């Protein structure tokens, strides 16, 4: 014997199914429509399922229109608002292009002509320059080793005589940065030590003339036992030596008789405020004037002799002997030996100038 399935006590065989008898359902239309896009809401009412940007406006199905879109009243078409360089052509949104812009491989790009290039990781690894437009430079213009903040630099060769003046012009001679001249300035303030600190003013000018150095030297003693020469009271006082010692870069060493802070490249009638770091081109040539070694031959060309005169008087001569690279504890050296044979009585030591030249290291 089989049993029949018993219906629920509240089962209602009349459409709509599943609703309690006390619900207010104004219509009893059977659900002969698809639920895709439709809904039974409110209960008993067939309505549309809406998702943005579809909406109901004034009982009409409408479209929510945001910025950049417009619904044309005449045609009822939805259009895009454009401003140049954007435009509509053949119902397509495009961009108006003019040189040097173009579209290549569906990408907006820049047409770079001669002298211009867009840096990629394959061409340079400089930080900040990848994917940027740069100016291609040849020899002497710019550098691939540093990023100069977008500026194009002109490289000036060291020791070549070229520099930039205050106006940014490239000049062969710059009076404010004359790197062709190393000197002590023309003033008479003491800068040298003979037997005590700052007892004399050594005036020395070295000017580079190609492979030679043109030099001019003079001396004024302002203090100490050499200020006034009196060989009657001090007959042994017949000479002294001033040494200029330089390191491998041509920088004056502290152990020199000349004060280091008084020696630099020329800046008008003074010296540059920043100490120089290299001046090998002004140094005596090590082949022409070799350092003394055991058994090495000493040549007469290693010495320059001359006469200077105390007080500018021809009857008061002093011999000046200049030698090159003869000192120890340095890479290069210039040595001045001052001596006299006459007996001077109460003569002030103030000399005339002496000009000489020597072969430069570079």
Curated annotation (Swiss-Prot):
Pfam families per record: Adeno_knob (PF00541)
Main location as per UniProt: virion
Gene Ontology CC annotation, any one: host cell nucleus
Disulfide bonds: none
Intracellular or extracellular location(s): Virion; Host nucleus
InterPro entries attached to this UniProt entry: Adeno_fibre (IPR000931), Adeno_fibre_knob (IPR000978), Adenovirus_pIV-like_att (IPR008982), Attachment_protein_shaft_sf (IPR009013)
Induction line: Expressed in the late phase of the viral replicative cycle.
Keywords: Capsid protein, Host nucleus, Host-virus interaction, Late protein, Viral attachment to host cell, Virion, Virus entry into host cell
Any one Gene Ontology BP term: virion attachment to host cell
Role played: Forms spikes that protrude from each vertex of the icosahedral capsid. Interacts with host sialic acid to provide virion initial attachment to target cell. Fiber proteins are shed during virus entry, when virus is still at the cell surface.
Family note: Belongs to the adenoviridae fiber family.
Further comment: All late proteins expressed from the major late promoter are produced by alternative splicing and alternative polyadenylation of the same gene giving rise to non-overlapping ORFs. A leader sequence is present in the N-terminus of all these mRNAs and is recognized by the viral shutoff protein to provide expression although conventional translation via ribosome scanning from the cap has been shut off in the host cell.
UniProt free text on domains: The tail region anchors the fiber to penton base capsomers, whereas the shaft, built from several repeated motifs, allows the knob to protrude from the virion.
Name of the protein described by the UniProt record: Fiber protein
Lineage summary: Viruses, Varidnaviria, Bamfordvirae, Preplasmiviricota, Tectiliviricetes
């Amino acid at each position: 014997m089989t049993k029949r399935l018993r219906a629920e006590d509240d089962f209602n065989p009349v459409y709509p199914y599943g609703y309690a008898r006390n619900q207010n359902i104004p219509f009893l239309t059977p659900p002969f429509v698809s639920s895709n896009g439709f809904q039974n809401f409110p209960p008993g009412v067939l309505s549309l399922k809406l998702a943005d940007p579809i909406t109901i406006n004034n009982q009409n199905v409408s479209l929510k229109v945001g910025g950049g879109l417009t619904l044309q009243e005449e045609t009822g078409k939805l259009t895009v608002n454009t401003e140049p360089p954007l435009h509509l052509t053949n119902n397509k949104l495009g961009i108006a292009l003019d040189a040097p812009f173009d579209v290549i491989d569906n990408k907006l790009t820049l047409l770079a002509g001669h002298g211009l290039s867009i840096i990629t990781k394959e061409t340079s690894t400089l930080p900040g320059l990848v994917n940027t437009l740069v100016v291609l430079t040849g020899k002497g213009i710019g550098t691939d080793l540093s990023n100069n903040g977008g500026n194009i630099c002109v490289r000036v060769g060291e020791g070549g005589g070229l520099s930039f003046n205050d106006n940014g012009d490239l000049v062969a001679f710059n009076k404010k940065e004359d790197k062709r001249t190393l000197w002590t300035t023309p003033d008479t303030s003491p800068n040298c030590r003979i037997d005590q600190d700052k007892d004399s003013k050594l005036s020395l000018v070295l000017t580079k003339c190609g492979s030679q150095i043109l030099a001019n030297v003079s001396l004024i003693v302002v203090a100490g036992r050499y200020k006034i020469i009196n060989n009657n009271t001090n007959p042994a006082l017949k000479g002294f030596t001033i040494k200029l010692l330089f390191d491998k870069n041509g920088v004056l060493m502290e152990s020199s008789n000349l004060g280091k802070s008084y020696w630099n490249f020329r800046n008008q009638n003074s010296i540059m405020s920043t100490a120089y770091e290299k001046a090998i081109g002004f140094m005596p040539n090590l082949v022409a004037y070799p350092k003394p070694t055991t058994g090495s031959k000493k040549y007469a060309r290693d010495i320059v002799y001359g006469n200077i005169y105390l007080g500018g008087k021809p009857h008061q001569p002093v011999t000046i002997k200049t030698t090159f690279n003869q000192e120890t504890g340095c890479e290069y050296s210039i040595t001045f030996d001052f001596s006299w044979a006459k007996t001077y009585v109460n003569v002030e030591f103030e000399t005339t100038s002496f000009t000489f030249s020597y072969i430069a290291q570079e």
